[in-house]
Amino acid sequence: MDETALRALIQRIIKEELDPDRIPIGVSNHHIHLTEADFNTLFPNQKMTVLKPLKQPKEFASKQTVDIVGPKGTIKHVRVLGPCRAHSQVEIARSEALNIGVPAPIRLSGHLDGAPSVKLVTPDGEVTVQGVIIAKRHIHMSNEDAKRFGVKLGDTVSVEVQSQDRRTIYNDVICRPREDFVLEMHIDTDEANAANVDGNTFGKIVKA
């Protein structure tokens, strides 16, 4: 690479690094949210134990895992996220839903009406949960971020995911502003693999 090309590359990288409108892409692996009652059934005499904090405030991956049992198969050792919620919810990718024979709909978190059921199993207990979904892609953002992007809660935007060799535009991305949210777009593992997303991938809103 000659000096002119190298200088242009460095300038482009610096510009991208300083761009306030770029959005970190977070890849959401399959996971489970549990009510306190369901947690106690699956893990009697245990407390939910923090494995590592997540990017959004007060949320964490716990040390506890469960097996998801569907009509055609099982997904083993699926991480429980904390803290406990008002409703238990299972989030898996489309490919996983097909593998275990569950017709999971694409929904935002918490929108569980009509979602199918699966059995959750640990060595100490089992529960049947109605609430298996494929998470609809969305962007967590602060209220200040929302003002900067010119969006409000529930707005739909398109985001160009700026991954190497596979730049991809994702439509139908839901904006989810809240005062304490940290800016991050969430996609599932199927979407991430299709777009060659790694742990240092960013996106940018291209249409609002």
From Swiss-Prot:
Q: Which UniProt keywords apply?
A: Acyltransferase, Bacterial microcompartment, Metal-binding, Transferase, Zinc
InterPro entries assigned: PTAC (IPR008300)
Database matches in Pfam families: PTAC
What exactly does this protein do? Involved in 1,2-propanediol (1,2-PD) utilization within the bacterial microcompartment (BMC) dedicated to 1,2-PD degradation by catalyzing the conversion of propanoyl-CoA to propanoyl-phosphate.
Instruction: Name a GO molecular-function annotation.
Output: acyltransferase activity, transferring groups other than amino-acyl groups
The residues listed in the UniProt record as binding CoA, with positions renumbered to this chain, are V27, S28, N29, K72, R79, N193
Co-factor: note: There are 2 Zn(2+) ions per monomer; Zn(2+) and CoA bind inbetween the 2 domains in each monomer.
Where Zn(2+) 1 binds, per the record, is at: H31, H33, E91
Keyword flag Metal-binding = yes
Catalytic activity, EC: 2.3.1.222
Q: GO annotations under biological process?
A: propanediol catabolic process
Protein's pathway: Polyol metabolism; 1,2-propanediol degradation
Residue positions annotated to bind phosphate are: R85
Enzymatic reactions: propanoyl-CoA + phosphate = propanoyl phosphate + CoA
Q: Which cofactor does it need?
A: Zn(2+)
The record ties this protein, via NCBIfam families, to: PRK15070.1
Per UniProt, subcellular location reads as: Bacterial microcompartment
What's the protein name? Phosphate propanoyltransferase
